[in-house]
Every structure is written in structure tokens, then in C-alpha cells.
From Swiss-Prot:
Major subcellular site: mitochondrion
Biological process according to GO: mitochondrial translation; negative regulation of mitotic nuclear division; positive regulation of proteolysis
Protein name: Small ribosomal subunit protein mS38
Family: Belongs to the mitochondrion-specific ribosomal protein mS38 family.
GO cellular component, one term: nucleus
Source species: Homo sapiens
Subcellular location: Mitochondrion matrix; Nucleus
Keywords tagged on the record: Mitochondrion, Nucleus, Ribonucleoprotein, Ribosomal protein
InterPro entries: Ribosomal_mS38_C (IPR013177)
PANTHER family xrefs: AURORA KINASE A-INTERACTING PROTEIN (PTHR32035), SMALL RIBOSOMAL SUBUNIT PROTEIN MS38 (PTHR32035:SF3)
Known partners and oligomeric status: Component of the mitochondrial small ribosomal subunit (mt-SSU). Mature mammalian 55S mitochondrial ribosomes consist of a small (28S) and a large (39S) subunit. The 28S small subunit contains a 12S ribosomal RNA (12S mt-rRNA) and 30 different proteins. The 39S large subunit contains a 16S rRNA (16S mt-rRNA), a copy of mitochondrial valine transfer RNA (mt-tRNA(Val)), which plays an integral structural role, and 52 different proteins. Interacts with Aurora-A.
Gene name per UniProt: AURKAIP1
Any single Pfam family the record assigns to this protein: COX24_C
CDD domains per record: At5g63150_CTD
Keyword Nucleus in annotation: yes
Length: 199
């Protein structure tokens, strides 16, 4: 592991003021030393429980906290020095300017621009408008079919209406004669068939 090698080399290179480093090397490198750990049981019948040393506390903390989850200040400093880029290294001259690419003209766009001049007057046909036109045509077609199917029945109903109008017209003429003092129509009088012309 690269981090372990760097740590071991750093520990060898740094001279210590005392005879021993402030923390055990085995704790930094992640190895365990088979030494006397913290124990609550007394060593002898007349002796009290021995207090744990500083190295034992570090080894106990090393066992309780996994190595992958804990990052020491030395490891964070080495990571910042070796792996992360420095802020003052990059200068304005080394940064390459972004390249600008000239896109070729689109043939579809040119054709659309030329065609827009002739199609500008034409209304835009949308899907909704197309559906409305188709529905209108279908309704007209169904209406024409219904008219053709019921043309004889409609003719019969129309003739009945005209006949009733003619009878009403003759009654109105008779009432006018009676108001004028005539008991009947004059000789040679024929009531016009204004509603039944072809009959």
C-alpha cells in the first residue's frame, strides 16, 4: 500500500527528541503488537490493577475504531500533499482557451427558409384541425346518406303539410266572402292552388 510505505519512510526520516515516538509505529502502520493490553484483573494478590499505558490506549482505540473509518492527521496531510493538486501551480497561461468550432450550414435549414416565403400565407394545419375537418366531412356524408334513405318519407310528409296549408287558405277566402256579404263564390271562380301547383 502506497500510504503505508510513505508513512514508514516518514517515520524513519524524522528524528525524535526522545528515544521513542509519541505513538507506536505498529499503530500507524495498522499492525498489531502482541504486547500486554489493558487488563482489569490484578497481576498479583497484593498488587492493584495496573493502569494502561499510552501505547495500550492507542492499540485499544485502533481495535475499536476500524482502520478504514479513521483517518489520522498524518494521513490527511500526506493525502493533501501527494495526491491533491496545489492551488498555486496552475497559471493563467497554461490553461488552454476553449476551441470554437464552425458548424457547416444545414441544408435542411436553407430549404426551410426558402420554403417559408411561399408557405407563409398558408395556414398551419395541426392535428386538432385535421381531426375537426375529418369529423365535419363524415357528419356531412352521414347526413347525405340519411336524406337519400328517407327521401320518399320526407316527400310524403311535405305533401301533407302543403295540403293542410291549401285547405287553410281556402277557409280564409270563404271567410272574406262572407264578410263582404256574398253567400257563395261568383260564377266562374276557381280557387287557385298556390300550395299544390303540380296537382
Amino acid at each position: 500500500m502506497l500510504l503505508g510505505r510513505l508513512t514508514s519512510q516518514l517515520l524513519r526520516a524524522v528524528p525524535w527528541a526522545g528515544g521513542r515516538p509519541p505513538w507506536p509505529v505498529s499503530g500507524v502502520l495498522g499492525s498489531r503488537v502482541c504486547g500486554p493490553l489493558y487488563s482489569t484483573s490484578p497481576a498479583g494478590p497484593g498488587r492493584a490493577a495496573s493502569l494502561p499505558r499510552k501505547g495500550a490506549q492507542l492499540e485499544l482505540e485502533e481495535m475499536l475504531v476500524p482502520r478504514k473509518m479513521s483517518v489520522s492527521p498524518l494521513e490527511s496531510w500526506l493525502t493533501a500533499r501527494c495526491f491533491l493538486p496545489r492551488l498555486d501551480t496552475g497559471t493563467a497561461g497554461t490553461v488552454a482557451p476553449p476551441q470554437s468550432y464552425q458548424c457547416p450550414p444545414s441544408q435542411i435549414g436553407e430549404g426551410a427558409e426558402q420554403g417559408d416565403e411561399g408557405v407563409a400565407d398558408a395556414p398551419q394545419i395541426q392535428c386538432k384541425n385535421v381531426l375537426k375537418i375529418r369529423r365535419r366531412k363524415m357528419n356531412h356524408h352521414k347526413y347525405r346518406k340519411l336524406v337519400k334513405k328517407t327521401r320518399f318519407l320526407r316527400r310524403k310528409v311535405q305533401e301533407g303539410r302543403l295540403r293542410r296549408k291549401q285547405i287553410k287558405f281556402e277557409k280564409d277566402l270563404r271567410r272574406i266572402w262572407l264578410k263582404a256579404g256574398l253567400k257563395e263564390a261568383p260564377e266562374g271562380w276557381q280557387t287557385p292552388k298556390i300550395y299544390l301547383r303540380g296537382k
